[in-house]
């Protein structure tokens, strides 16, 4: 039986601008008894049809739009079309950069709310993050098996956001083989080991690809400090850029061991490379007390803010760590600093970094504004898709 949602008067404006979310406070009434994931018809208060979406009774985002086309039904062909378009739109990038690891589907920005898919060689790794995507899991799997018959499909839906949708975390094989060993991918001629089963996110930070490449132009004959190094991506590019020394710092010994393997996999000389297991904040303070200086510092911390309530604390954390970095930079040194918190707006992040430089007593210049790689597109009607912000800053 069809379910009909009628919005509060005036709340249709965001949908007319093709934003894919309907919040609980924007709904005046529901006709029918939807279960989580059900496809629902969305109407303006005056009875105009607006969109077709997926119901989520547990979430503040009560419905996510599948389509704004009244003639388009949500079936296997729908998912085949969306996924095929997502692949074709990325094919030029894949060919240009020689990629065997890339984001195939970027959820709302690719018209598939709550569905993230990363491709690692012969594995497709899915994160199913919404009630709608969960409800359509079998159709999504069928579409992927049709389009990628040679690929195994693995799920990494072990993320806290599923709880907001009334879903439990889940991982495991959906189809094909289990990735028992790390998978080797390539980007820009660099080989990288990816632990699909146990690594961060779906195994690797594909969104930082362009920014990893950007670091290499600043590292020739330089001393480089790579903070929150994970499996060493920025450090590898720094070495390929001619760095005379690279210090990788992370709390995970497993990640550091893989960082070493990644450097060796690329045939790099690591005689002047360190892999240090330490808390970054504490180590930077220790370096400051010792008077250590670096020519290039990379700050790629984990997400500091998961909610608006955490944003103030996140601002303090970002300011503190960037101030420490400025204090460790040699004259003319370059800081590459990032925030992956979607709630952190570009202007706010830029202000935090500027304040950090001021508190460190350093004059600084922004050389580059950086963001996520282009296989992580940002829908023009979905600004929430712009989550990764980066700055390249030179300190005098």
UniProtKB/Swiss-Prot annotation:
It holds the Pfam family PUA_3. Its EC number is 2.1.1.191. Its main location: cytoplasm. It is found in: Cytoplasm. PROSITE patterns: PUA. Residues 2-79 form the PUA domain. SUPFAM superfamilies: PUA domain-like, S-adenosyl-L-methionine-dependent methyltransferases. One of its GO terms (molecular function) is RNA binding. GO terms for cellular component: cytoplasm. Belongs to the methyltransferase superfamily. RlmI family. Specifically methylates the cytosine at position 1962 (m5C1962) of 23S rRNA. This is Ribosomal RNA large subunit methyltransferase I.
């Amino acid at each position: 039986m069809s379910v009909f949602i009628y919005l509060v008067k005036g709340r249709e404006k965001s949908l007319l601008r093709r934003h894919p979310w309907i919040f609980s406070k924007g709904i005046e009434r529901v006709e029918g008894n939807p279960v989580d994931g059900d496809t629902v018809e969305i109407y303006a208060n005056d009875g105009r049809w607006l969109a077709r979406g997926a119901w989520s009774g547990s979430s503040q985002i009560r419905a996510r739009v599948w389509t704004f086309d009244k003639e388009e039904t949500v079936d296997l062909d729908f998912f085949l079309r969306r996924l095929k378009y997502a692949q074709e739109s990325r094919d030029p990038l894949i060919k240009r950069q020689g990629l065997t690891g890339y984001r195939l589907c970027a959820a709302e920005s690719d018209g598939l709310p709550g569905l993230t898919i990363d491709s690692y060689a012969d594995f497709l790794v899915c994160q199913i993050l919404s009630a709608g995507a969960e409800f359509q899991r079998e159709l999504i799997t069928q579409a992927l098996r049709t389009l990628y018959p040679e690929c195994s499909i693995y799920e990494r839906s072990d993320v806290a956001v599923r709880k907001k949708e009334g879903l439990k975390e889940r991982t495991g094989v959906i189809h094909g083989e289990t990735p028992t060993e790390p998978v080797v991918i390539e980007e820009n001629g660099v080989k990288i080991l990816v632990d699909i089963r146990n690594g961060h996110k779906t195994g690797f930070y594909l969104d930082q690809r362009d920014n990893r490449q950007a670091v290499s132009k600043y590292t020739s004959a330089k001393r480089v400090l790579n903070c929150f190094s994970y499996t060493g991506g920025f450090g590898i590019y720094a070495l390929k850029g001619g760095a005379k020394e690279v210090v990788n710092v992370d709390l995970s010994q497993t990640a550091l061991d893989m960082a070493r393997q990644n450097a060796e996999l690329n045939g790099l000389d690591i005689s002047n490379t360190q892999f240090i297991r330490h808390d970054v904040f504490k180590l930077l303070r220790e370096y400051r007390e010792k008077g250590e200086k670096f020519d290039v510092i990379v700050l790629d911390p984990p997400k500091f803010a998961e909610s608006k309530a955490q944003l103030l604390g996140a601002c303090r954390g970002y300011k503190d760590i960037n101030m420490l970095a400025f204090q460790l930079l040699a004259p003319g040194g370059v800081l590459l600093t990032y925030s992956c918190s979607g709630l952190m707006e570009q202007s706010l992040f830029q202000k935090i970094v500027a304040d950090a430089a001021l508190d460190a007593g350093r004059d600084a210049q922004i050389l580059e504004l950086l963001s996520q790689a282009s296989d992580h597109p940002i829908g023009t009607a979905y600004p929430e898709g712009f989550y990764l912000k980066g700055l390249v800053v030179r300190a005098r």
